[in-house]
UniProtKB/Swiss-Prot annotation:
It comes from Caenorhabditis briggsae. Residues 1-60 are annotated as: Disordered. Residues 26-43 have a biased composition (Polar residues). This is Armadillo repeat-containing protein wrm-1. The keyword Nucleus applies. It is found in: Cytoplasm, Cell cortex; Nucleus. GO terms for biological process: asymmetric protein localization involved in cell fate determination; canonical Wnt signaling pathway; cell-cell adhesion; embryo development ending in birth or egg hatching; embryonic body morphogenesis; endoderm development; endodermal cell fate specification; establishment of mitotic spindle orientation. The keyword Cell division does not apply. PROSITE patterns: ARM_REPEAT. It comes from the Eukaryota. The lineage of its organism: Eukaryota, Metazoa, Ecdysozoa, Nematoda, Chromadorea. Coiled coil: none annotated.
Length: 799
């Protein structure tokens, strides 16, 4: 039997014939789609064919025809309503089609009324505008250029002419929507391409911007989508960084509206007024098509540096500007208080409050008097708050809480606990701002009256983060929070803060590797320096935490401090970590490390045993490092004293010199104090190492380092160190004190010059003099005995 091809009529196809060019007739390259495969092979003949008919494709043809006819009828109604201006868009969730309608149906749709409406059959054929934009839902895709099928219908001899400036202004001022749409379609591509300033001169651009703002003045009959498009054009005109001409036009128009005597513009608005109030009036109309676009423009013309400088600066204190500042802040606060306000709009309001409050102290006062702190507290308490709202709120809180009384107001509301409840949030940028705010709050006295146990536990859980910013700020919170309330340190110890701090220090090389990656990537030097300072801050914070929880001041809870010392001594990494920072750390880290070691060894003497043979980074043991650090810091202390004397009081240089002097003073007296303890009470090998270092390796005489300008605390510990190393059994037998005094050529009368009002120092000097005199007598006796013994041996020699 002879095979036949598929029946053409069966599928309703039409023969193709060439037509002459007609600009009013759209064309298409889409062919009709058959409802089933055209192959004559049966399923048995081609069982493995991927094109085999599937059950879902084998529906009765009548249902398919019925569906396509209904679709064509809906499409015609949809297009007719659109063209007659009666179109009401359906709900986006219920919308069937994702494209704007075509002005004219496609060829196949007109011929067969069976083609389903798709993005290929819903084409723009407007030959006057190469870009058909979506006027209803911004989320819908729009044609970026004229489609190929529409290009076929354009007359190549007819070129599109640009609208003149008077035509644009007149069209925008018109009450006819079609005229406004034509002007907007002229401006929108230029605005999106950021080409308005390069296309128009300043005078022409000023006329256009003024006309756009005039469209925003409420009218009896207006289209919300036109208003939205106007807001978008104005926003795109102002958003680029380098559009000084546009910014000046905005500012000039604003000043003219604020001037009650100006009659230049015919805006039907009360005087005084401003472009800000024009935008605010539109933004306050919630649930409109343009409220979000209005808020976006308002945030831009409030927070951009140019407008903050010339509109919201503290220098602008005229009556009109003060009134404007109050209007903007009142609107922002009111918007935050309304439940109906969209969360994105609330985020814009918070950003406006944050930026303008930082720039202008009077605006800060206006906002504070409008009770902005309870509003911020409500935002962070709301578990459904969006990240885009929480993030600027955290930034604003950090700004406001830098003022002590404001921070205490926030803490009294329970704000610190509510902030810590957000520590489980997945946003990194949010955690950065949250912990920065908590660092400020943790220094306030009011936080001592709050129950912070759960909050402290949550902060401890994030200190081990690989994010250096989170680690720095979390450790900063723990460093501060124990000061206002000593009970907080008990909570920290109970939750294992010592182990967490040591673990961060033990694994700190991960931060160094991140820093090396930045250096290899040729990151700018200022960012490299910031990263180095951040890592140093992490070290200081962790060592400060260990220092704070082991502190035994008069207000501290001794049981907790002793427990912290025991926990540190039991940690297998503690000794190597503390020795490393004494060896290679910055001065502040050295001070904290030696202080922690001193306290732990004094309370748990067994903690000294690991240091007997433990080498540091430079292969030097603890007693040698303590001796080196004491002498190095003593020299630095002398230099810092001179810097303090040469610096002007109340200057940064003076404060830096004071801090440097204090750091090195602490290193000196704490190092020699710990060394004295080790020589007296520790393993005898500690003294052996000190003896070899001072007498043989690097001959050192402690008396030569004494000088009258020594502070009391250094002098006392230095004298005690001399007594400690000269009071051992070996030293007494070998008259080490007398050896040092004789070598330094120091008399007992000279030592009396070091007496101070402090009786403890006087006692130390007296003990040194007494010990020196006894050892001198002992030395003289030994010499006499040696001389007598020599004489006896000489006499016994045969003549």
């Amino acid at each position: 039997m002879e095979e036949r091809g598929p029946d053409i009529e069966k599928y309703g196809s039409q023969p193709c014939t060439p037509l002459s060019f007609d600009p009013m007739l759209p064309s298409t390259s889409r062919v009709a789609t058959p409802v089933r495969p055209s192959s004559t092979l049966s399923a048995r003949q081609a069982p493995a064919s991927p094109f085999r008919a599937q059950p879902q494709n084998m529906e009765p043809s009548i249902s398919r025809v019925h569906e396509l006819r209904e679709g064509a009828a809906v499409k015609r109604s949809y297009t007719n309503d659109w063209m007659q201006g009666n179109y009401i868009p359906p709900n986006p969730q219920q919308q069937q089609y994702q494209r704007p309608p075509s002005m004219i149906g496609s060829t196949i749709s007109n011929m067969s009324n069976l083609s389903h409406m798709t993005k290929f059959s819903a084409l723009s054929v407007n030959t006057q505008c190469g870009q058909f934009d979506n006027w209803i839902y911004q989320s819908q895709p729009a044609l970026s250029k004229v489609s190929h099928s529409s290009v076929e219908n354009q007359d190549p001899m007819k070129r599109r002419e640009r609208m003149s400036i008077p035509e644009i202004v007149q069209s925008l001022a018109s009450y006819e929507m079609s005229d406004q749409v034509a002007a907007i379609r002229e401006l929108e591509p230029l605005a999106k391409a950021e080409a308005l300033e390069s296309t128009y001169c300043q005078a022409d651009l000023g006329k256009i911007i003024n006309a756009l703002f005039e469209v925003l003045v409420p009218r009896p009959q207006e289209n919300e989508n036109v208003i939205r498009k106007v807001f978008e054009i104005l926003h795109r005109a102002a958003v680029p960084k380098h559009v000084r001409m546009t910014e000046k036009i905005f500012h000039s128009l604003n000043l003219e509206l604020m001037n009650t005597n100006s009659s230049k513009h015919s805006f039907q608005v009360p005087r005084p007024y401003s472009i800000y109030e024009l935008v605010i009036e539109r933004a306050s109309r919630l649930d409109t098509a343009y409220d979000q676009a209005a808020m976006l423009l308002l945030a831009q013309i409030c927070c951009k540096p140019f407008f903050m400088k010339y509109v919201f600066s503290e220098k602008e204190q005229s009556a009109g500007h003060r009134r404007l500042h109050e209007v903007v802040m009142q609107f922002a606060i009111k918007n935050l208080q309304q439940q109906e306000t969209k969360r994105k709009s609330k985020g814009f309001c918070v950003s406006i409050i944050k930026n303008l409050s930082r720039r202008n102290r009077s605006i800060w006062s206006i906002v504070y008097e409008l009770h902005v702190i309870p509003i911020f507290h409500d935002i962070i308490k709301d578990e459904y708050s969006d990240e885009d709202l929480l993030w600027p709120t955290m930034q604003a809180l950090t700004t406001f809480c830098s003022i002590e009384r404001v921070g205490e107001d926030f803490v009294k509301l329970g704000g610190a606990q509510d902030l810590c409840n957000l520590l489980y949030h997945g946003s990194t940028r949010l955690l950065h701002e949250l912990l920065a705010c908590m660092q400020r709050l943790s220094l306030l006295q009011e936080i001592g009256n709050q129950d912070m146990e759960e909050s402290i536990r949550r902060v401890i859980q994030v200190v081990g983060s690989d994010d250096a910013t989170i680690a720095e700020r979390a450790t900063g919170v723990l460093r501060n929070i124990g000061q206002p309330n000593k009970q907080n340190k008990v909570i920290m110890v109970r939750n294992g803060v010592t182990a967490h701090a040591i673990a961060v220090l033990r694994t700190s090389m991960r931060f160094q590797s991140q820093l090396r990656e930045q250096q290899n990537a040729r990151t700018p030097k200022n960012q490299i320096d910031a990263a180095k300072n951040q890592i140093l801050s992490i070290y200081e914070n962790c060592l400060s935490i260990l220092n704070n929880v082991t502190k035994m001041g008069k207000d501290d809870i001794l049981d907790s401090a002793i427990q912290a010392c025991r926990m540190i001594s039991a940690n297998p990494d503690a000794a190597i970590v503390l020795l490393h920072f004494l060896n290679a750390g910055a001065p502040k880290c050295r001070k904290l490390a030696v202080n922690v070691m001193k306290r732990v060894i004094e309370n748990v003497p067994a903690f000294a045993e690991p240091f007997v043979d433990l080498p540091g980074t430079t292969q030097e043991t603890l007693p040698i490092l303590l001796l080196k650090r004491a002498y190095e810091s003593l020299d630095e202390w002398k230099k810092a004293v001179v810097e303090v004397m040469r610096s002007e009081p109340n200057t940064q240089q003076f404060r830096d010199a004071i801090e440097k002097r204090q750091d090195h003073e602490d290193i000196v007296w704490k190092s020699v104090s710990l060394l004295s303890n080790l020589c007296r009470n520790g393993n005898p090998r500690f003294f052996e190492r000190v003896k070899v270092e001072m007498l043989y390796t690097r001959p050192t005489n402690p008396f030569t380092s004494l000088f009258p300008e020594m502070s009391d605390v250094i002098l006392y510990e230095w004298l005690d160190f001399i007594l400690a190393i000269c009071g051992t059994e070996w030293s007494l037998q070998n008259c080490l004190m007398y050896h040092f005094l004789k070598q330094a050529n120091i008399t007992h009368e000279y030592l009396l010059h070091y007496r101070r009002p402090n009786p403890q120092i006087c006692d130390k000097i007296k003990n040194i003099i007494d010990t020196g005199m006894r050892q001198q007598q002992q030395h003289n006796q030994l010499e006499q005995m040696a001389m007598m013994h020599a004489q006896q041996q000489h006499q016994q020699l045969p003549m």
